[in-house]
Amino acid sequence: MSPFFHLAVILSLAASLACAQSSVASGELHGTVADPSGALVPAAIITVENSVTGLTRTVPTDEAGEYRVPSLPPGEYKVKIQKRGFRTQVSSDLRITVGQIAVLESKLEPGVDNEIVLVTSQAPMVESERSHQAETLQQEWIQNLPINRRDYLTYTLLAPGVVDATALADNADFRVKQTPHSGLSFYGSNGRGNSVTVDGGEMNDTTGGVRENVSQDAVEEFQINRSNYSAELGGATGGVINIVTRSGTNQFHGGLFGYFRNDALDAGNPFARVLEGNTLTRIKPSSRREQFGANLGGPIRRDRTFFFAAFEGLIRNESSVVSLLTDPSIFGPTPDQEALLRTLPAATAGPLRALLTSPQSTIDLFQRNSGVFPFATHDWKFSVRIDHQLGSKGQLFLRHSYAHLHEQNANLQALVGATRGTEVSLADPTTIAGWTQTLTPRLINDLRAQWNYHNLLTDSVEKYGPEIRIQGYGVFNHDWVLPTRWLERRYDLKDHLTWQRGTHSFKFGAQALIRGIHAENKVFFAGRFTFGDLPGSVLGIPGLPDSFTLNALQTFNLGLAQTFLYGAGNPVIAQTYPYYGFFAQDSWKLRPNLTIDVGVRYELDTHKAPLRTDTNNFAPRIAFAWNPSADKKTTVRGGYGIFYAPIYFQIDYVVQALNVINGNRQIAQVFSTILDTTAANSANVFSTLRAQNVIGVPTPARSITTADLAQFGMNFTHSGPLPPFTLIFENARDFVNPYSQQSSLSVERQFGQNWALSLEYAYVRTLKITRLRDSNLKPAPVDPALGIRVWSDPVRDFVDPLIAQRNIFESSGRAFYSGLIVELRRRLSRSLSLDANYTLSRAVDEVTDYTIDYEPTDQTNMNADRALSSFHEKHKFVAYAMWTAPGNLQFTPIFRANSGRPFNLLVGYDLNGDRHDTTDRPAGAGRNTGIGPDFWSLDLRVGRSFKLRETTALDFTAEAFNLFNHLNYASINNVVGNITGPFNLTGRADRTPSQPLGFTSAFDSRRIQLGARVRF
């Protein structure tokens, strides 16, 4: 859509409505008023005024001398208290943050009400009435901490109990590009099941990811709700992040900024090597990054109407490092094979050596795909917000935002070849509007409406297929599940009503989210060949020992593909599926030092056949906040609740497009193996198509078509009898929404004026997690030599021998998390503020994600996959600070350290004969028994501000990410063959990426960024 369209939207809506300030985008003020004797004062008049916008709210105290002011936009406030017979008291500099329940206790002095008493006491650090576990990051942190990409969601990783869901230790990361997740693992979750809101409007997509939204400069602050949040928040089994954007004020303010990087200042990458002749040469990847933007805010009409606009652009021209080829010896016999060759007669050894040695075409394939490759990112964000006050009883605001992203040659890393890169194009406009109205001093209504359009296109840079997966060595060519295009239109309407009655604060609300989607996903259309280890007996050479094995690279050279997968048909699914949510919540101040929060939420996540709608998603929640000490500097909080996540549309798509419904197949698929005795044998298909120049090595010749496959008897009709070795994807009849049971208990204590220490225990039990299982397998007998089930009989071991796989989505996965959290905070005092937290945790689950490659090793024993989660970090420590030194120098460091994550050992071929070649572990090995490398890094920003005029300043900053250039290995080659135990293995720095347990990639080495900002 053109920029003129978005400008038209802003101008046409500016005179109408805007977003409501519900508690997901606002805070509350609770207070008591007493006389000098401590007796509570009823009917006092409380006036709360925003210091920069003039927003005013007036409420009386009740019979108990208490008052509540909900739905306050984040900001600085002054509170005026008036009562006949007492002096008027004014408290200033009271900060209200998003999701906060601020408490103000006041004592009035006798006198006449035209006498004013100014109170400037500091607010307590401990939120004495907050019952759930949460953190709030204010603008001071957002603007000054060194964050690598100015992505404010990355700040969430600073919170305890949250880890990076994008960083698996397994080199074989089977999650697919078109089903992104949030990147945030709350309490051991897999990155899905979280929810993000901006100004109260949801910013999630249909797969559990987060949509592009606004510039970091447009963010006022955000709250991270880790667990036990109220019934007002829903659609998540993990965390909920509430982001609030900045508004204009009575003063014009704005700025320009730019941040710049160049590889001349950066450290090199240890995996950046290219093969020149027979020599590996280290090179330094090129890198250029410019990130720039501007913002402007101010009054349209003083004390009445305001605006704030922000723009941000990111241009990256950098390099990805692919470590496919760091050891040329992989193209010859292995050391064990060399030892055998020396014992064989020359007449046998010579031809065998030739078979074990890669041809030039294979060497060219690796050279073409390994090394350093450019990638580019262009990311643009723009937003305008308008606020309008309807006197003292109503507020309107409107925000329109637009995000555009284009990535070229992304997704390259480790053993993912250059021809497997992806191209992403995204357009995402959002308009949100609403109205907050004070109906009576004790009754407030919030109405909010949002419209979003999400257009995402993901394709492979290499337009031809098929995908070639050489287990443990590399993945090449067109991604087998691309291209894909998702068009979403989401209409979100919410209404919340807050009613104050005595010691109760009731909230009631409803939401209707209409999700319309047009999905075009050419899954399997490119085809995929998989190569793994095979016994040497396939060569037919007499005299070879039974232990002689061909590795995956050698089977590729010989054209011995273990499996082949292909699909064709109509890739389009379009439908509308609404979501409805309803809640009721009561915050009851049972005693002056005890608050009980009780609520229930009901969610109706509708779906169309063959999925069914789960109609019993009731989510009760209860929590408390208790202040055992009279000074209210100690708060004990805890709670329990049930939380539901949606079923993501990718599952709707698969069970409609890749299923057999009423005898029809929208996308017909075939699957063949090397064990097939017909012409459709996967090795025969590969060798024949390669000889016919349909498959080119090293350069793909063209895409495979159904006409090419007809010669093998492969049938792609979409009705009638199923052809042999069809793949089917279905959902279980009892397939339902995942849910979590969250419980926590914490104690927080303020020490002195500026320090606070908290101790928390959290336990989360997540059930009904989506997973895939092949239901076509019968329980097979245990092979006495291997000690595992082996499906060796192609007839008796399968429910339907003519079906290759019947993959069924089930609600059978489970996850368990327990964690102990210690957090120390110091608020700004003597130029220093600090936050440090430590998490000791254990995360256990049974599945990593819901793709076919994460199915269990033993499909008839799902419990055998219960193990430490891929997102388990036993120890995590984070500390960050802000210090202003003499000379107006500001230092803001972030130190992060965590223990290594588990990784899954894979054989690299179909060891147990179940027709799955990416799920097998070494015989006897449990899931995720390997332990990845530890991580630590120090980031630092140094800045200095120069005053140009009274209201204008120039800031210069220098940032170093991974200041000490510590080598943090990221992923491990987890294809190890059928090794014997023990299996508690770690990565090996003395091995190359193409060797088992060799490290395949590293996190960023030291990066330097220089920046400048003008503020006025």
Question: What is the predicted function of each stretch?
Answer:
Residues 2-138, 217:
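Periplasm-facing N-terminal accessory domains of Gram-negative outer-membrane beta-barrel systems
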Residues 80, 86-247, 262, 266, ...:
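Periplasmic N-terminal accessory/gating domains of Gram-negative outer-membrane beta-barrel systems
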Residues 152, 345, 614, 619, ...:
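Solvent-exposed loop/turn elements at secondary-structure boundaries
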Residues 182, 237-239, 290-294, 380-384, ...:
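Hydrophobic, lipid-facing positions within transmembrane beta-strands of outer-membrane proteins
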Residues 591, 754, 758-890, 894-898:
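Gram-negative outer-membrane beta-barrel transporters
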Residues 710-718, 888-951, 955, 961, ...:
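Extracytoplasmic gating/loop element in the C-terminal half of outer-membrane beta-barrel translocons
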Residues 968-1016:
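C-terminal beta-signal and terminal closure region of outer-membrane beta-barrel proteins
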